Amino acid sequence: MAGCVLADTLIGATPLGAAQDGAELHEASFYEQLAGGKIRCKLCPRGCVVGDKQRGYCRVRENRGGRYYSLVYGRPCALHTDPIEKKPFFHVYPGSKAFSIATVGCNIACKFCQNWDISQASPDDIQPPYQSPATIAQRAVESGARTLAYTYTEPTIFFEYMADCARAGKARGIESVVVSNGFISAEAQQALFPLVKAIKIDFKAFTSSFYRDICDGFIEPVQASLRRMAKSGVWFEIVVLIIPTLNDSSDEIKRMAAWIVKDLSPDVPLHFSRYHPMFKMKNIPPTPPDTLRRARQIALAEGCRFVYIGNVPGEEAQNTVCPHCQAMLIRRYNYRILENNIVKSACKACGKTIPGVWE
């Protein structure tokens, strides 16, 4: 696996053990100390080896004297209350709200990222005020949200903050959900599972070349991550952003869907989302809706039971239909629930259990 791009600490960086407004820096998890004052990060598959006064690829974790610190603990740069369907989760608490947070930074670099202004930023670029996990959890309660969502950037890189927010939320009756690229180490992922109710994975494509050339990442660790989720019992859904000419071939979609059915489960909800020109790929036009419909039909034919189309207002394939009796289960319009016929986790018409987190 390729090595890391490390960033030298800027002159005048925050002194060891203190942040600029007096809040303490938080020591990172998942690292080991090496000779010569270096450390090896074990949070994600990059395994960055970081020298003193350097940062890992994500730009938000720094070696200071042989100890590794998170520079974004307690520093959310984005906070918003969203419908949970916007994440999107279609089989998790339909119609509920999610209090969404993010810090700067990411451990990959997608050329089409819609949140590039924060995902590709560093703590030196954006310095929001400190907010403790207890504060975040209380804000979630006051917002009327049922869940805390770690989203917009990559939650893996603010793991310690996410974990503490999840614990604080749980103590106040708020569950946690994660929107992730799945690029996380096995050790960190196993620590995450008990803290969260559901995970949504942005599965970028089904080719190594796409991950390498478009995202500066690797597909194999993401596949391994998805397999671990399937074995863990944690609910998860998959979103694939279909980009014209790059990951929209019928063959690739067929192979991806077949792999999901075989290696994960036919019950994993699969969302095909429409691409809109963004960041470094503004030259590629939006995805034709018919391309998404073709992808959906291929996935259904391969055995996926719940296949959705996203970013197309009014699309019929936003709805959830019972795979047993074909009754309408959940009728949606954009992010609103118009009809919900799931009763005690089962289809109201035929009584068969519908996979998801409903209650």
Describe each region flagged by the PLM.
Residues C110-C113, V178, I238, C350:
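Hydrophobic packing within well-folded, soluble alpha/beta domains
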Residues F90-H91, Q190, E339:
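Short secondary-structure boundary/capping segments
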Residues Y68-T156, M162-A163:
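Extended interfacial segments that mediate partner engagement and assembly in macromolecular machines
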Residues Y130-D290:
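Conserved AdoMet/S-adenosylmethionine-binding subsite of the radical SAM
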Residues A2-V49, L246, S250-E359:
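Auxiliary Fe-S-binding modules of radical SAM enzymes
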Residues L43, Y57-V60, G105-I108, F112, ...:
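Short, cysteine/histidine-rich loop/knuckle motifs that typically chelate Zn2+
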Residues D21-R40, R46-A102, W116-Q120, M328-R331:
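N-terminal [4Fe-4S]-dependent radical SAM core
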